[in-house]
Amino acid sequence: MRVVIQRTGHASVTINGTCKSAIRKGFMILVGIEETDGKEDIDWLCKKIVNLRVFDDENGVMNKSILDIDGEILVISQFTLHASTRKGNRPSYIRAAKPEISVPLYEQFCKELSFALGKEIGTGEFGADMKVELVNDGPVTILSLIHISEPTRRY
């Protein structure tokens, strides 16, 4: 599973000219699912995301989590996170899971993340052509590559 976590002042996703989801201060998360991803990866990642201390405390030190600031989360499915550009000039997405695997895992990830956050999260629409806008705060951007089910591949 590949995840890009961006600390944001606000973010939104628009589909066919209509705003589907919008958030204020929090995280805008891009998530790419692989064939080998599973529930263990989702559980670990959701716990990690809500406990990441990347928001400033009263002293300007990144010491608060999204739970501490009562922040919001917007999650966007992004199979292109699995692009391989080693050969040629056209990216290969062979590592990205097929929709029959990735859709249920994406939905489970969103459900578990919402539960861990303690409130609803915003989402895009799997497979849709989306326009995503955000103000990256900091900027703070964290790339997380995780395979709990395959410890030797842990990044």
Positions of the model-derived regions?
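Short beta-strand segments
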Residues: 6, 32, 77, 133, ...
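Compact, glycine-rich, soluble single-domain proteins
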Residues: 19-70, 80-111, 116
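Residue-level signal for inorganic ion chemistry
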Residues: 45, 76, 140
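Glycine/charge-rich, flexible interdomain linkers and switch-proximal surface loops
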Residues: 58-73, 122-134
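Positively charged, low-complexity, intrinsically disordered RNA-binding extensions
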Residues: 93-145
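Single conserved hydrophobic/aromatic residue that forms the stacking wall/gate
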Residues: 146-155
